[in-house]
Design a protein with these regions (language model features):
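Conserved catalytic core of the tyrosine transesterase superfamily
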Residues: 1-297
Length: 297
């Protein structure tokens, strides 16, 4: 097996079979290139790699003081690479199969409570066209749990408001349908009927929902700044970004008793373990559950 040929085939596999984004593909190839460089240093051929060699490689990488998260991601990338070799090159074993990833302490994301969300939305000046647009943005972010990249690329042709669904393009160009609540629908209709017609829409942006004052697609940075300005306006001390609304959407659903698989589908998570981070519940809520339901409380 020649590294150059294998890497080209692996890239094609990630593009066509896994349907990954360019960013994710680059990350996988970067992991493989690290292993290739180490093999060259040790004068080991690709078909000679075994579990012991991978262990030595990981120890070598660890000497550069990389984080446990980066180590885990690297090992995950190599697992995918060797699984590909098993499929496409009939490699007999996967030398990463028996190796354990470093234990990760998942950071619980910062979320907003309902009062904070209401305060942010109430701080918007609705006397301006931009204010009405911004209110709609926050209602959709919180009401649908979108990534900011999904929000700014949202298309009018993918709004099915009569049946209360929208379609978004997520990571790896994967499409998914998401239910949308009445409040978000209400303001989307107002924005589309009363605000957007006053914007001089530029060619190529006719189908984009959220536009700037020049009629072009909003940038992710612009959405970030809108939210930062509102947080400053109400004196919100905790760190906040567009993604905070996605975290809040998921957390409030799970705390309210929503099925974790349903939340996973709405968020577009490939793995249920990613969604499980939202099963954290504040101590006051836990205490209220004990008080209400336990026979000896």
């Amino acid at each position: 097996m020649k590294w150059d040929i294998v890497k080209k085939d692996f890239k094609r596999y990630l593009q066509l079979e896994r349907n990954l984004s360019n960013h994710s593909i680059d990350a996988y190839l970067n992991d493989v290139q690290k292993l290739e460089a180490y093999c060259s240093f040790k004068k080991i051929e690709l078909n000679q790699i075994d579990t012991r060699f991978i262990q030595q490689f990981l120890i070598f990488i660890n000497d550069f003081s990389i984080s446990p998260f980066t180590q885990a991601r690297l090992l995950s990338g190599l697992r995918t690479f060797f699984a590909f070799l098993q499929i496409e090159y009939d490699k007999k074993d996967n030398p990463t199969e028996l190796l354990e990833s470093p234990r990760l302490n998942r950071k619980i994301p910062s979320v907003l409570n309902i009062e904070e969300i209401d305060a942010l939305i109430a701080a918007i000046d609705l006397s301006t066209l931009e204010g009405m647009r911004n209110k709609t943005i926050l209602e959709v972010l919180y009401g649908c749990g979108l990534r900011v990249s999904e929000l700014v690329t949202l298309k009018i042709s993918n709004l099915y408001l009569d049946v209360e669904f929208i379609k978004v393009e997520g990571k790896g160009s994967k499409e998914r349908l998401i239910p949308i609540g009445h409040q978000a629908i209400k303001y989307l209709k107002i924005y589309l009927e009363e605000v957007r017609p006053h914007i001089p829409i530029q060619a190529g942006h006719e189908d984009i929902v959220f536009l700037n004052r020049r009629g072009k697609q909003l940038t992710r940075v612009m959405v970030f700044l809108i939210i930062k300005d509102l947080a400053k306006k109400i004196g919100l001390a905790k760190p906040i970004s567009p993604h905070t609304f996605r975290h809040s959407f998921a957390s409030h659903l799970v705390e309210g008793g929503a099925d974790l698989r349903a939340v996973q589908d709405m968020l577009g998570h490939e793995s249920i373990t990613t969604t499980e981070i939202y099963t954290h519940i504040d101590k006051d809520y836990l205490q209220s559950v004990i008080t209400q339901y336990h026979p000896r409380s």
